[in-house]
UniProtKB/Swiss-Prot annotation:
Xref: HAMAP family: GTPase_Der (MF_00195)
Species whose genome carries this gene: Thermoanaerobacter pseudethanolicus (strain ATCC 33223 / 39E) (Clostridium thermohydrosulfuricum)
Gene this chain is encoded by: der
Family in the record: Belongs to the TRAFAC class TrmE-Era-EngA-EngB-Septin-like GTPase superfamily. EngA (Der) GTPase family.
Residues binding GTP 2: 183-190, 230-234, 295-298
Gene3D superfamilies in the cross-refs: 3.30.300.20, P-loop containing nucleotide triphosphate hydrolases
Domain KH-like stretches: 353-437
GO BP annotation list: ribosome biogenesis
GO MF annotation, one: ribosome binding
Record-given protein name: GTPase Der
Xref: SUPFAM superfamilies: P-loop containing nucleoside triphosphate hydrolases
InterPro entries (alphabetical): G_ENGA, GTP-bd, GTPase_Der, KH_dom-like, KH_dom-like_a/b, P-loop_NTPase, Small_GTP-bd
EngA-type G domain ranges (all copies): 4-169, 177-352
Amino acid sequence: MAGAMVSIVGRPNVGKSTLFNKIMGKRISIVEDKPGVTRDRIYGNVEWLDKKFILVDTGGLDPNAEDILFSKVRLQVEAAIDASDVILFLVDAKEGLMPEDEEIANILRRAKKEVILVCNKVDSFKEMPPTYYDFFSLGLGNPIPISASNGLGIGELLDEVVKKLPQEELEYTEETIKIAVIGKPNVGKSSLVNKILGEERVIVSNIPGTTRDAIDTPFSKDGKNYVLIDTAGIRRKSRISESIERYSVLRALAAIERSDICLLMIDATEGPTEQDTKIAGYAFENGKGIIIVVNKWDAIKKDNNTVNEYTKMVREKLSFISFAPILFISAKTGQRVHRVLETVDKVWEEYNKRITTGLLNNVLNEAMLMFPPPADKGKPLKVYYTSQVGIKPPSFVVFVNEPELMHFSYLRFIENTLRQNFGFEGVPVVISTRKRGEN
């Protein structure tokens, strides 16, 4: 399942990041970095044996991960358990069984999650180090031996991971609009969901989504079918306080993966935070429709310029999703909440929009006559034609003489031309180049 989450946990210095990077390097294709998107490489999309999941490096979640106190290791592990479907519990064969390993194992045994015990730093399978057998006492099954540094045993480990992934979640029809309500804790996600559903009063049913406790709520309005994926239901009462903010990003990932359109909720009293930027970046990189919903607008003192000034500030901080419409609402009072679904419908239309090849090339050819493709080191870039190759999000291929001659600034010009002529409000536009004659 695309939204399943697998976290690597363990005490400091057992090789969590090394294992993460080894799998990343072998099996993960990261979407190319876009200007303005904060990428902190703590997670990546993995596909193995036709199964997809999100791999999380918990070591990367805390900048001081390698010297944190044990109490923080415990918080980190508990937070990872809360957000994940499968846990890779990494131990160190060279150092052997440590008290911290036993404490983490105690936490994991109480958790109702799939746990795979992974014994790192085993350099050869011909003769296991004596310390390897000590880990059987943890009661978490046979340790899978690996060497994260040289890749030994990684394939066998991934085989085991896909066996333990949860079953596919409920499938909805292509016409059902899947909406993820995302944002950091206490921004008002549940209040917005309740207000939307309270207005419509046509809830079909509450369906427990995945093992992450997200709640899928299907409902209908004016003949259209929607599903609200509410990540707020994931945040349980917990002793975790310091880690909760960090892990809220992880909780949003699975919901984003399953959605078509994301409602990125921002607290009007705080403005966009670094956390909001991370969540928005993930939605953008995964090609989702995005609507920025500024909540708690009733708590802001206003004058004639407040909306314009606030809009400018949001655009500056979230410049990479400048295509996203901004709504100012109060989930508490219901102010302008009716506009949320109206905007979702508009973005959904843009998300599914197709442009005929003839019209597309007429518009682009006219624009390119005014602003011809640049030459690189004297060699001119020739653009032959452009085709739309997909929707959700709208995707285009530009056929050229030499793809390496295409500068990102000219791709940006093509994107801007498409937006000016065809709209695409609220959705990313994916443009790639291909040499003419290539399939």
